[in-house]
């Protein structure tokens, strides 16, 4: 098959591993920077171009679209979809998962466990917002933040009020969540592929830090999931409409709680912690599902 990988970083671990895994299985792979693409949209034959040339036909596209380019990256991916190319994660699922508030609302409607979450627009609502999530300590999150950036633990009510007021003053969209103390600065990343969790790791925050993101200095280790955790992770990914997702769970006194569903989960941490060939599993999934939709293009 001919496979396109939408990525700004051909040198990144995840991109290189996907190229390696696809090549080993006999596929032709091209890494495409979505920001270099431009599109011809018409009723006869839509197309995608780079540098004055039209892209050749592809059988499948694997999106590795960073949060900062969600709008344009999703538009390019949507163009591939319009042209009949199988997308591992489609543009709707990616856009849905990137909206943290919408994600929470959708999962809440499906009865998926979540930290109590509050959202408000007016500073006058701050006291009620804090009470709504159980008071301090609490977590304040920028809706546009990634990799632990824009996440603040407010340990006192006064600190919470000050931080929320500051964010609101900057016209930043935030949400407020209860702090799950019993998680002890750890979360679980479940790597969902289709209807299975193919790998999972526990991420532990550095001493004195509550964010467990590996980009923030957290450490990763192998973890054994409970059947409930496995089920919750798969349901969360399906709620977003994603075939591939990194679902982040907290272990609480009242069961697993979903923190976030990531539509472009990194491979380095999960493969390093589990020694599993996650990239190979992704390519195998693409093979099975792309071939169901159309005849493969000859590489």
Curated annotation (Swiss-Prot):
Mn(2+) 2 binds at residues 260, 262. Mg(2+) 1 binds at residues 248, 260. ATP binds at residues 141, 178-179, 187, 211-213. GO terms for biological process: protein modification process; SOS response; translation. Residues 104-287 form the ATP-grasp domain. Gene3D superfamilies: 3.40.50.20, ATP-grasp fold, A domain (3.30.1490.20), ATP-grasp fold, B domain (3.30.470.20). The keyword Manganese applies. This is Probable alpha-L-glutamate ligase 2.
């Amino acid at each position: 098959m001919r496979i396109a990988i939408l990525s700004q970083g051909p040198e990144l671990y995840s991109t290189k591993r996907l190229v390696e895994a696809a090549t080993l299985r006999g596929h032709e792979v091209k890494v495409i920077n979505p920001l270099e693409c431009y599109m011809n949209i018409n009723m006869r034959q839509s197309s995608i171009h780079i540098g004055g040339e039209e892209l050749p036909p592809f059988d499948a596209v694997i999106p590795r679209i960073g949060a900062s380019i969600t709008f344009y990256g999703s538009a390019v991916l949507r163009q591939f979809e319009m042209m009949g190319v199988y997308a591992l994660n489609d543009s709707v699922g990616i856009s849905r998962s990137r909206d943290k508030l919408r994600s929470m609302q959708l999962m809440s409607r499906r009865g998926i466990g979540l930290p109590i979450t509050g959202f408000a627009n007016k500073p006058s609502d701050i006291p009620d917002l804090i009470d709504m999530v159980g008071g301090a300590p609490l977590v304040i999150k920028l809706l546009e933040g990634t990799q632990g950036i824009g996440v603040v633990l407010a340990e006192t009510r006064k600190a919470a009020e000050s931080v929320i007021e500051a964010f609101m003053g900057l016209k930043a969209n935030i949400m407020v969540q209860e702090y799950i103390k019993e998680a002890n600065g750890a979360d679980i990343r479940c790597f969902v592929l289709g209807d299975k969790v193919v790998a999972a790791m526990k991420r532990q925050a550095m001493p004195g830090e509550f964010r467990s993101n590996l980009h923030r200095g957290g450490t990763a280790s192998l973890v054994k999931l409970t059947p409930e955790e496995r089920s919750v992770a798969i349901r969360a990914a399906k709620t977003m409409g994603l075939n591939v997702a990194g679902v982040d769970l907290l272990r609480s006194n009242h069961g697993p709680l979903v923190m976030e569903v990531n539509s472009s989960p990194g491979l380095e941490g999960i493969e390093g912690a589990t020694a599993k060939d996650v990239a190979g599993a992704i390519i195998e999934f693409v093979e099975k599902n792309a071939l169901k939709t159309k005849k493969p293009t000859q590489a």
